[in-house]
C-alpha cells in the first residue's frame, strides 16, 4: 500500500505507534517516538514512504536521506518501493532488509536480522499475507514467493518456496558433533 495523502500517513502512525483504540495526539506520538527505538524507526520509515510517493525531486531526495539515516542508525534497510500495509511491527529494529519488490500485508511482525528479497531486481514480487509473524534471523529469498495469511515463521528459517495459509513454518536444523582430529590420530 502506498501512502499518498497526509491523512493516510497519520492513520498509519495512529495504528502502529499510538494504537488504533486510543485517541490521536501529536504530543503522545512525539513522546513515544522519542522514547522507543521501534516507534522511532516506524515513524521515520512511514514518513520516508510518504515522501517517496509524493511528486518532485525534493521530496524524493528527502525520502532517500531518511532511508539512509535509518540504515545508518538502526541497520534497517527497507527499500522505498516496498509496499507495506498497516500494522508493521519491528520489535528490535536491527539488521532488517526488505527489498523494493516486496508486498507485506496487514499486521506483520519482523524481528531482528531478517532478510526478505530476491537476487535479481526483475523478479516477481514476494508477497506476505496478513498476520505474518517472522522470527529472528530469517531469510525469505526468491522470486514470486507467496507467504499466506496467519503464518508464523520460526527463528533461523530459510524460505525459498510458497507457504500456505494458517501454518507454522520452521527449518529443521540437525546438529552434529565430531571429535577434533589431532596429529596423534593421523
Task: For each feature predicted by the language model, list its residue ranges.
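Terminal amphipathic alpha-helical/low-complexity segments used for targeting or macromolecular assembly
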Residues: 1-74, 182-186
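Left-handed beta-helix
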Residues: 74, 80, 85-86, 91-100, ...
